[in-house]
């Protein structure tokens, strides 16, 4: 494979925002895109896209398992020896209630996927990113994880997990700054995905303002992905450790 290609790995590239990232990137000239799915056989939209795009490689990955992350990295090394941009987009979001009645299993599942998951992917792919030319790591985060720009809505375990992810990003950016890495978090905006719509519908009766906000302001996955890529395409060393909004503005931690 040509060493002039720019190599991307998108963890969670089988639907929604992740799939839109895969599509836009793979339509660019000189790119190779690895897209992960927990169950590749069930990722029908990604499978269909890869059939017409030979530069897309589907990788099995369950981010909650370090073993799975290591196996995914090994699969990538069968094709390339470096990755330029690592984008961890995998996440769960099934917490839309107050802290007082959010059970342990909800906290644990969010932490396992949204915090340990990105850590597993980073640990497994660090050797590949270190060999890359761009050395960019992107974590898809959320405004829900910002305390400085607190959104007045009960998102308990989800918000806490994204706050922890932002801290993880900040620490990694510090640890890798002397190695030439650029590490950021980015909020994709309120995005019109199937999972987001389902959550909004579940809580529309008690929180009608959420339904209204979602209907008026939600982005399509394609728009969110395109805007975030504009941010990532223009990253410079001095941007290391920042928390971005999809439109390129900075979000306080």
From Swiss-Prot:
Q: Which domain of life is it from?
A: Eukaryota
The UniProt keywords, alphabetically, are:
Cytoplasm, NADP, Nucleus, Oxidoreductase
Q: Which Pfam families match?
A: adh_short
Stored SUPFAM superfamilies: NAD(P)-binding Rossmann-fold domains
User: Where does this chain mainly localize?
Assistant: cytoplasm
Q: Which InterPro entries match?
A: Fungal_SecMetab_SDRs, NAD(P)-bd_dom_sf, SDR_fam
Which annotated residues bind NADP(+)? Answer: 17, 36, 62, 89, 158, 162, 191, 193
Oxidoreductase found in the keyword field: yes
Catalytic site positions: 158 (proton donor), 162 (lowers pka of active site tyr)
**Which biological processes are named by the entry's GO terms?**
cellular detoxification of aldehyde
Q: What class of enzyme is it?
A: oxidoreductase
- State one molecular function term (GO): oxidoreductase activity
For whether the record's keyword set contains Transport, the answer is no
An annotated GO cellular component of this protein is: cytoplasm
Q: Which Gene3D superfamilies match?
A: NAD(P)-binding Rossmann-like Domain
EC numbers for this chain: 1.-.-.-
Which compartments is it annotated to reside in?
A: Cytoplasm; Nucleus
**Similarity annotation:** Belongs to the short-chain dehydrogenases/reductases (SDR) family.
Protein's name in the database? Uncharacterized oxidoreductase C663.08c
Record organism: Schizosaccharomyces pombe (strain 972 / ATCC 24843)
